[in-house]
């Protein structure tokens, strides 16, 4: 039997490093978070966070101007969360980002919430769907962590 060293992480891309810092800050704010969640066909959010009062936040991590400019789907995420945020590093020109969205600035070790995203509460049915999706996504990630050789038959 071989044992996987959970402390050794694979090489992370710049956006994933920002996501790591953001998830640390979200945890400090009392949120649980998952990365790369698909709320609906054609969309994949970088970070979804579930707050202590059931609030749902989506955070999109951008590592460069080119990364931001190539993202034409971000406004499609707004209908899947109570609040929407960008997360960028300290060198990113934040003037490029829409002012009516939230903002984290960080790195792989942490992040700071600079601007709270405006709240648009989800309808009860959408909230139930997203909470279930969050729980399922988290459980499957945990399953694969414990059994990385499993070939899941999840649809």
PLM features: residue spans?
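Catalytic cores of nucleic-acid endonucleases
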Residues: 20, 63-107
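Short, flexible loop segments at the rims of nucleotide/cofactor-binding pockets, characterized by
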Residues: 36-38, 60-67
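N-terminal short leaders/motifs
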Residues: 1-7, 54-62
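Non-catalytic C-terminal interaction segments of nucleic acid-processing enzymes
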Residues: 2-11, 16-35, 96-155
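Short, solvent-exposed loop/turn elements at beta->coil junctions and helix N-caps
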Residues: 35-39, 91-92
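Short secondary-structure boundary/capping elements
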Residues: 14, 39-42, 69
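Active-site beta-strand-loop-beta-strand hairpin of nuclease catalytic cores
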Residues: 41, 45-58
